[in-house]
């Protein structure tokens, strides 16, 4: 066995999961707390993710129903600063970019969508969730979605903070973050439906 093969085998064995899978699937109960905070009226955030909704109602990514609301709705609407913004394309690959919230600008797959809502002047913190919306000042998850989730990245103020791939340990699904080298589990305790191994 040559040195390159030995290194590849060691690297594979040292990973904290058994296999990469094509996707994790939720049924409207599960969610993942990405442990990435956003400061309202301050941060610039990009989220790139590949999602296939399995039901036509439910929202995902992150937000709250108070002063701040940012997410994607399966019924063809964006949620941004409390306002629903219709969109016309049936996206599966989501590329969201939100400028500091004082600018009230949301870009989706390169298209600008403006909200008519006016955000408050205060700076609140928000958590980014996948499969659900997070709330202001660490409020509980809400608006859970039914979807198939594959890779996802989160960039905050120009820095890559999460780079997720769906994996399994035994028959339990996780998102593995290549940035922090950590497994992120379903916070509900229900567990994800696993896609096939890659």
Which positions does each model-derived feature cover?
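Short, aromatic/His-centered strand-loop micro-motif at the edge of beta-sheets
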Residues: 74-96
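Extracellular beta-strand elements of beta-rich domains used
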Residues: 150-154
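Extracellular glycan/ECM-engagement signal in secreted proteins
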Residues: 157, 163-190, 198
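Localized edge beta-strand/strand-to-loop motifs within extracellular or lumenal beta-rich domains
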Residues: 88-111, 155-157
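Extracellular glycan-recognition modules
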Residues: 16-81, 156-162
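Surface-exposed loop/edge segments in extracytoplasmic proteins
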Residues: 83-86, 111-116, 159-163
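Enriched but not universal
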Residues: 1-21, 180-198
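Flexible glycan-contacting loops in extracellular carbohydrate-active proteins
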Residues: 116-148
């Amino acid at each position: 066995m040559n040195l390159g093969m030995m290194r590849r085998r060691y690297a594979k064995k040292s990973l904290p999961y058994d296999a990469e899978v094509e996707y994790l699937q939720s049924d409207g109960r599960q969610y993942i707390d990405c442990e990435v905070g956003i400061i309202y009226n301050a941060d610039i955030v990009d989220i790139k993710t590949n999602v296939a909704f399995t039901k036509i109602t439910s929202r995902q990514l992150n937000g709250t129903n108070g002063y701040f609301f940012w997410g994607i709705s399966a019924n063809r609407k964006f949620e941004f600063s409390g306002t629903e913004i219709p969109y016309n394309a049936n996206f599966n690959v989501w590329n969201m970019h939100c400028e500091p919230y004082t600018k009230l600008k949301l870009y989706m797959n390169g298209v600008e969508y403006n909200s008519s809502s006016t955000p408050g002047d205060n700076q609140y913190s928000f958590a980014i969730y996948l499969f659900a919306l997070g709330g202001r000042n660490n409020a509980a998850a809400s608006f859970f979605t039914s979807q198939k989730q594959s890779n996802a990245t989160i960039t905050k103020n120009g820095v890559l903070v999460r780079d997720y791939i769906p994996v399994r340990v035994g028959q339990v699904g996780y998102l593995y973050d290549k940035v922090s080298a950590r497994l992120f589990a379903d916070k509900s305790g229900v567990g994800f439906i696993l896609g096939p191994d890659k």
